[in-house]
Amino acid sequence: MAFNFNWSPLMADAGFYTRAQELLTAALNKSPKPPIIVDDIVVTELNLGSNPPELEILEIGDLAEDRFRGIFKMSYAGDAFLTLKTCVQANPLNTYLLTRHPFASPQPLAAATGLTIPLQITLSDIKLSGFVILVFSKQKGITVVFRNDPLESLKVSSTFDSIPFVRDYLQKEIEGQLRILFMDELPAIIHRLSLRLWGTEYSELETTSAQVTNPPLEGPGLDPLLNPPEDPVDASGNVLSTSEIASLSLDSGVEMHSLFSRKNVLRLAALTDSQRTLSLFTPSIQEVVFRAWTGLMEQADGPSGLVSPMSPPLSRTHSHVATSSLSLQDAASLASSSHSRLSLPSTGFSGYGLSMGAGRHSKAHARKRKKRVVDLRRRPKNTDDMESVSGESEFTESTSAASVFSGSTIPEENNDDPVTPPGSPPRTIRQPTLCDRIVARNGAERNARRGIPAEFGHDIPASRTTLPTANDIARMLATTSSLQQQLHPANSKSLPPQVPPQEPALRPSLTSNSPYPIEKPNASNYTSSGDSQQQQQQQQQHQTHLPSSLIMEAAQSGGILEQAWMMKMASEIARRIQDEKMGGEDAAGSSNNKNDNKNNNTGGFWEQSLMRSHTPPPAYRH
């Protein structure tokens, strides 16, 4: 099958060449150019020649009146030519030095600046050979796709043909650009040209887009600043009259740009005075700009938020003043009661109570809170009442501390809450309680020191929070023995054991102010032997200066369970001592001298059984 190409109509149409030159120019400048080319590449001449290409049909996929699809083998060796015009850099050394450090450049240079030379290149003797896929449709135009690189050879003629290395360089670069042109850009160019020829809708759409891209010039635009505002003012803020505006406009039109509206100036001044933020409660400090961020008071708002008096927030000044006054009173009360029994939860409680009234809202918009004060502290009326009521002096407080906490809101708490009220300042004189007098009276009736039986060491309630230490028991026994030496009569009669009443329920505390370390209770800690009696005598000599009020200090500093256990231990010890004393008198009724010796040397069944053990308790091992 043969084809007849009507090549002459393409050459006769002048508009076709013009559109083809524009498309080729855009395609050549689309890809990045080498650094030696410093100007755009412009297609000045285009001629397809008189010899058409040769096509060999390999396959026809679709054939109809308005569409065609086929695969061809194309070969072209005609007289078509193409002329390009651009500018090149005549100093390649300068182009090379632009990408290098100045320290590495040779000095001096023969030509430190580049010389731009116009270049004209003509491409001729183009030979093409390749496989082409051709698709034709009246609605979609012509689509040409090359399956391989069709460019075989071409001739490049330029103004630098007399310089061999420049000629070879241009030949190599232009061939590379043309290969990209045939594979990527030429099919798109042919498709757009075919749409212009057969598709009227595409031509109208392209014309409309060109008008939008390049709008026609309707004359110079109007300057809105040349029109004076309604209430003009000068640079100093003074209102200008109509005559002053007319005089300014007659002199020169430049002065009109310095006129501003009075409303705009006032708004700008208000914005400047507000320190560039929207917060209405910022401190008025000159030359300081505050941002409208969330302050510390808003971030720490809630039951767990504690505000430090050393870092007050900047958002609300009136709230900050109230917070500072309360914080100062709280600091004074804490300083006066540095040795009081304040635990960690109670400290957080007092801080939360003070921060309740310092919220985000001002006092003007806040509701009045009920100042309900739950006072759990007991104050002694006189010395006689203190002697009759046990444990009452533990919660005596100063008047200043009460005044501080009465001004803050204290929420109601359950009785099981381990939070304690603020402690009292240190006291120098402490009155003996009822428990102290009972223990002193029971200890005065004993003739010799008895050890604590081992079976009592395990009689500990399971619900106790803190265990009594061996040092507390030793200290109690040492104080009792010292009182027994002072108050021991010649012939004392045995008294029936008396169980002291328990103290009223006090509020438990998590911490204890005992100066002795907490030790794990063991049976051996409560047993006494020959070695333990010597060590207890040494402790007695060292602790004789302690007052009798320290006997029940560990019990009073603990909770209800600790006090009950200590009272039970004291009553059991007193009862056992009385039983042993009565048993020793009955067994040794033959002579009074032997009875005295037994009372002084032996301690009954418990101490005789404990004397057999010579192993020291684990608490005294080294």
Swiss-Prot record:
Residues 214-225, 388-404, 533-543, 592-601 have a biased composition (Low complexity). Its main location: mitochondrion. GO terms for biological process: mitochondrial genome maintenance; mitochondrion-endoplasmic reticulum membrane tethering; phospholipid transport. The keyword Transmembrane applies. Residues 482-495, 522-532 have a biased composition (Polar residues). Residues 211-234, 303-322, 355-432, 445-464, 482-546, 581-622 are annotated as: Disordered. One of its GO terms (cellular component) is ERMES complex. GO terms for molecular function: lipid binding. Component of the ER-mitochondria encounter structure (ERMES) or MDM complex, composed of MMM1, MDM10, MDM12 and MDM34. Component of the ERMES/MDM complex, which serves as a molecular tether to connect the endoplasmic reticulum (ER) and mitochondria. Components of this complex are involved in the control of mitochondrial shape and protein biogenesis, and function in nonvesicular lipid trafficking between the ER and mitochondria. MDM34 is required for the interaction of the ER-resident membrane protein MMM1 and the outer mitochondrial membrane-resident beta-barrel protein MDM10. Belongs to the MDM34 family. This is Mitochondrial distribution and morphology protein 34. It comes from Ajellomyces capsulatus (strain G186AR / H82 / ATCC MYA-2454 / RMSCC 2432) (Darling's disease fungus). The lineage of its organism: Eukaryota, Fungi, Dikarya, Ascomycota, Pezizomycotina.
